[in-house]
Regions:
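Short, well-structured N-terminal submotif of metal-dependent ribonuclease cores
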Residues: 1-37, 49-61
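Short, hinge-like loop/turn segments at secondary-structure boundaries
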Residues: 52-56, 91-92, 133-137
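Active-site neighborhoods of divalent-metal-dependent phosphate/nucleic-acid chemistry enzymes
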Residues: 72-126
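General small-molecule cofactor/ligand-binding pocket signal
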Residues: 36, 72-75, 142-144
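Short, conserved catalytic or adaptor-binding loops enriched in Gly and charged residues
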Residues: 26-29, 62-68, 133-136
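Acidic, PIN/NYN-like endoribonuclease modules and their adjacent C-terminal/linker elements
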Residues: 1-2, 112-155
Length: 155
């Protein structure tokens, strides 16, 4: 059975800069992990790349990854809206209050029932979704850094 893996913004940059990390993702895909991301992640990547002199080169590489890995691009739905709203009302984790974009990335992965959320953001890894969402049967994907995902893929 295929596992759904959502990539946060930084993971794409890691893969663009490291052949070893690209190879890891190729192994994951060969082992039935399916890669997902969102329109918001793509937009954030483009905004970050625009600040760099190598914009065209990076953008070409990024779009090549989207195609090569057959990444599913998620769009907003009612579940994303509900989760984003509940995240915005949750003031229990002070690290996440100002992190609207990061919370939205996690909302996409949660709404679309992704099994894993891969990120380099420690606050997202430790973040506990509001109890109200758990009671509504939303489940936070297992949230891991790329190194932990590597151990999972290679096991």
């Amino acid at each position: 059975m295929s596992k759904k893996v959502f990539f946060d913004t930084g993971i794409f940059f890691d893969c663009l800069e490291s052949q070893d990390k690209k190879t890891l993702i190729n192994h994951a895909i060969n082992r039935k992990y399916h890669i997902f991301t969102s329109l918001l992640v793509i937009g954030e990547i483009i905004l970050i790349m625009k600040r760099d002199a190598k914009f065209a080169e990076y953008l070409t590489g990024f779009f090549s990854l989207l195609s090569e890995w057959k990444i599913t691009i998620l769009v907003p739905n009612d579940g994303v809206a509900v989760i984003c709203y509940d995240f915005s009302q949750d003031l229990t984790d002070g690290r996440m209050i100002s992190q609207k974009t990061d919370r939205t990335h996690l909302a996409y992965a949660t709404a679309y029932d992704c099994d894993y959320f891969i990120t380099s953001d420690d606050a997202l890894i430790r973040y506990k979704i509001p109890r109200r969402l758990n009671e509504s049967d939303y489940v936070k994907p297992e949230t891991l850094p790329l190194e932990a995902f590597k151990k999972l893929v290679m096991s």
